[in-house]
């Protein structure tokens, strides 16, 4: 899908192949950094590795987080949701989304700084979401039944930052990146079935091998005691989480 912003001429949602045609140097840097990591034989997420190899990844590049930048992201995300509806279960049509932010869009030094920025973005998206919160999904981040929703779709938002030094699987290069997938897709490919549990175990064993520290204490599956919001932004150390989710649900 190739959606053009008529005012700026910038493509909102672009394919992996189209990134090479971009006139923005930082877009090429993002693609190169992501590719360098996903091409590593030990990178834990086998689905991301496969998607990159097959050029299935979609991209949204965000220049700023002012109103114009958030609107640009929201419109691209709406296109991604439309693309992802009625998925047929074929991994060849499972398109992960990488949302990359320019270095000028963010002033952060620590993992917590980057996470705060990520939650600010998700909050702003929620506040301009054109659709009601997804039915059956809790509006309380401290509920196991909560996840981020936008345009009527449940989403999982993986925050990756250059400040993640030990948790290498959450560092995709110089830029802050959100890797977004429809949450319910995980129920299909890695759900609570014998095959799904085997896939999750394999990926988490790969995390232990790839990262400089053991897998996060907060990892889990949706609907269990593990909270989704804590898994969006994993700390660079294994400690009990005492912080609160900054996301606040707003009634329409």
What are these regions (language model features)?
Residues 63, 67, 99-112, 143:
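Short, charged/polar micro-motifs that form catalytic or ligand-binding hotspots
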Residues 102, 151, 158-160, 181-183, ...:
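Structured loops at beta-to-helix junctions and adjacent beta-edge loops in soluble globular domains
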Residues 91-95, 99-107, 162, 183-185:
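Short, flexible beta-strand-to-coil junctions
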Residues 60-63, 118, 158-160, 179-181:
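Active-site ExK catalytic segment of metal-dependent nucleases
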Residues 163-205:
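Compact mixed alphabeta submodule
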Residues 1-92, 106, 116-132, 190-252:
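Non-catalytic accessory regions used for complex assembly or targeting
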Residues 136-174:
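Aromatic/basic-lined ligand-recognition segments
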Residues 111-118, 170-176:
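"Short basic amphipathic alpha-helical interaction patches in structured regions
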């Amino acid at each position: 899908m190739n959606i053009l912003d008529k005012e700026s001429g910038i493509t909102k949602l672009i394919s992996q192949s189209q990134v090479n045609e971009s006139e923005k140097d930082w877009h090429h840097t993002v693609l190169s950094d992501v590719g360098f990591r996903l091409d590593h034989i030990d990178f834990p997420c086998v689905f991301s590795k496969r998607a990159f190899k097959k050029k299935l990844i979609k991209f949204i590049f965000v220049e700023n987080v002012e109103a114009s930048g958030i609107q640009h992201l929201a419109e691209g995300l709406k296109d991604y949701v439309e693309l992802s509806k009625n998925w047929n279960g074929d991994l060849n049509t499972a398109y992960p989304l990488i949302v990359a932010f320019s270095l000028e869009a963010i002033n952060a030094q620590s993992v917590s700084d980057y996470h705060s920025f990520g939650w600010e973005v998700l909050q702003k998206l929620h506040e301009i979401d054109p659709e009601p919160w997804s039915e059956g999904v809790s509006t309380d981040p401290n509920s196991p039944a909560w996840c981020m929703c936008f345009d009527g779709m449940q989403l999982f938002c993986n925050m990756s930052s250059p400040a993640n030094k030990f948790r290498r699987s959450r560092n995709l290069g110089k830029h802050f990146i959100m890797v977004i997938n429809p949450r319910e897709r995980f129920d299909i490919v890695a759900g609570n079935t014998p095959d799904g549990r085997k896939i999750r175990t394999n990926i988490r064993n790969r995390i232990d091998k790839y990262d400089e520290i053991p897998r996060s204490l907060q990892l889990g599956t949706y609907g269990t005691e593990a909270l989704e919001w804590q898994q969006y932004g994993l700390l660079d150390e294994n400690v009990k989480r005492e912080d609160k989710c900054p996301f606040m649900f707003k009634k329409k």
